[in-house]
């Protein structure tokens, strides 16, 4: 696999921040810095970086740190302009000479680090992927906030005055939420503590209900997006809208992940060789995208319960002496391969255009 230095003539390394981006133009042949600039994080600043790159003719690539965070806007702008953009999620950091640290230095390091690599990731792009990521983040936040509030409500019930606590005795947490949402604090106006507890319990319960409704609304939007972008995913055994959305946001678009082995590594489903001498063994992969790994785990568990072919496979592997945990790891690797091949296969023009628009 050739290094980036063999494919381009200049690399523009960019150190991204909230208000400014600092860029350094570095030649591929010598690694020399030929120009640097700091621009604001707006359309004018993005265009200034394009003009900076255009002043140095020849094949070029942009190397961005934080293309999924502060550099997201710039990455979109560059992609729309047809520029080659590579993502540096965890750039190698050499020892700083005399403690040197600045945005221009980091931009130069980003460019030189990109030049030395043989494997470079492309930023996640596409409006459909971005929309899914937004809905998924909001849904996850709503679910977590609802769970936190439920725990707080349960704890408050336990320490509440006996007349209040008696209303919830024998109820599950979910039933407590329903009961608390219907409380009428003014009925305990003569008791300051009871009135306050009833008031807070009702507010907490209504907050939980609101957050649940939000999460449900986001899930419906996610399902509609997945169905319009990649309906073929939903036809796979064990793949629902949330699992499909998790897979799509990690994969992003065709060609971003260069092979099914790389996709398995991204998902943390590829075993790590740990052999020595005559001993051949593999170590569990605990890296990668853990949300994607969880999605594969969900698919594997669902298929083990409901899919006859998967259950037959598990029985065969048990007969060979494999443990249930080892069988699940094997299944996740096979599922990663199946998903990758499906995602990289051609789609209808309408579905492809949805994320390319």
Describe these PLM feature segments.
Residues 102, 235, 241-320, 324:
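Phosphate-backbone recognition surface of nucleic-acid-processing proteins
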Residues 79, 85-123, 130, 134, ...:
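Short alpha-helix plus adjacent loop in nuclease-associated cores
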Residues 18-44:
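Short glycine-rich, Thr/Ser-proximal phosphate-binding strand/loop in the N-terminal lobe
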Residues 277-278, 282, 314-357:
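Low-complexity, acidic/Ser/Thr- and charged residue-rich accessory regions of DNA metabolism proteins
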Residues 2-27, 110, 142:
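Gly/Thr-rich phosphate-binding beta-strand-loop-beta motif of the actin/hexokinase/Hsp70
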Residues 44-61:
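Short, basic/hydrophobic alpha-helical segments
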Residues 135-232, 356:
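Glycine-rich, often acidic, oxyanion-interacting loops/wings at catalytic, nucleic-acid
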Residues 58-70:
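Short glycine-rich phosphate-binding loop at a beta-alpha junction
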């Amino acid at each position: 696999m050739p290094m980036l230095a063999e494919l381009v003539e200049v690399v523009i390394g960019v150190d991204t921040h909230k208000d400014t981006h600092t860029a350094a133009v570095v030649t591929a042949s010598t690694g020399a810095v030929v120009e640097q600039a700091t621009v604001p994080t707006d359309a004018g600043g993005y265009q200034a970086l394009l003009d900076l790159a255009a002043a140095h003719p020849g094949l070029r690539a942009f190397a961005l740190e934080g293309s999924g965070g502060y550099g997201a806007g710039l990455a979109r702008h560059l992609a729309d302009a047809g520029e080659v953009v590579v993502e540096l999620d965890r750039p190698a950091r050499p020892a700083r000479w005399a403690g040197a640290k600045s945005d221009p230095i980091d931009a130069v390091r980003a460019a030189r680090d990109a030049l030395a690599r043989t494997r470079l990731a492309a930023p996640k792009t596409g409006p459909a992927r971005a929309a899914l990521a937004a809905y998924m983040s909001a849904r996850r936040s709503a679910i977590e906030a609802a769970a936190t509030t439920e725990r707080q409500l349960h704890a408050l019930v336990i320490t509440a005055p006996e007349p209040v606590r008696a209303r919830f005795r024998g109820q599950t947490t979910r039933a407590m939420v329903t009961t608390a949402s219907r409380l009428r604090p003014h009925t305990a106006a003569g008791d300051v503590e009871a009135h306050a507890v009833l008031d807070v319990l009702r507010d907490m319960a209504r907050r939980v209900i609101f957050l649940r409704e939000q999460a449900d609304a986001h899930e419906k939007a996610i399902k509609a997006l997945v169905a319009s972008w990649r309906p073929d995913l939903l036809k796979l055994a064990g793949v629902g809208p949330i699992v499909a959305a998790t897979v799509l946001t990690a994969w992003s678009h065709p060609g971003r992940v260069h092979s099914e082995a790389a996709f398995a590594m991204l998902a943390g489903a590829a075993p790590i060789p740990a052999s020595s001498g005559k001993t051949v063994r593999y170590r569990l992969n605990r890296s990668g995208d853990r949300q994607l790994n969880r999605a594969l785990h969900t698919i594997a568990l669902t298929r083990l319960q409901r899919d006859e072919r998967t259950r037959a496979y598990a029985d065969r592997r048990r007969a060979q002496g494999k443990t249930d945990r080892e069988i699940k790891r094997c299944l996740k690797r096979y599922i990663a391969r199946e998903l990758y091949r499906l995602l990289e296969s051609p789609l209808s023009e309408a579905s492809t255009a949805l994320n390319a628009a």
